[in-house]
C-alpha cells in the first residue's frame, strides 16, 4: 500500500511504496506506522490527542512535522 508523507509547513511531499519503507525512513518500527494508519485518524491529530502517552508523542516527533496518509486518504485530502 502506497504511503504519502506530507509536511504542510514546507509543502514537502514524500512517496513510499509500503508502510515498512516509510517507517524505516523516519526511524520507526513498521508496526508503529501500521497502527497509526489503521487508527483511522490522521497522524497529526494523534499528536494533539490528550489521551496519548508520552512514548507515542516521542515516536510521532520523529515525523518532523510530516503527516502520513494512505494513497486513498491522500486523494481525499488534496
Where are these regions (language model features)?
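Extended, non-core accessory segments
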Residues: 1-78
Amino acid at each position: 500500500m502506497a504511503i504519502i508523507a506530507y509536511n504542510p509547513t514546507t509543502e514537502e511531499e514524500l512517496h513510499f511504496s509500503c508502510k515498512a519503507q516509510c517507517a524505516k525512513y523516519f526511524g520507526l518500527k513498521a508496526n508503529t506506522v501500521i497502527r497509526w494508519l489503521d487508527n483511522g485518524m490522521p497522524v497529526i491529530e494523534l499528536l494533539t490527542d490528550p489521551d496519548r502517552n508520552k512514548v507515542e508523542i516521542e515516536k510521532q516527533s520523529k515525523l518532523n512535522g510530516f503527516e502520513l496518509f494512505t494513497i486513498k486518504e491522500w486523494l481525499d485530502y488534496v
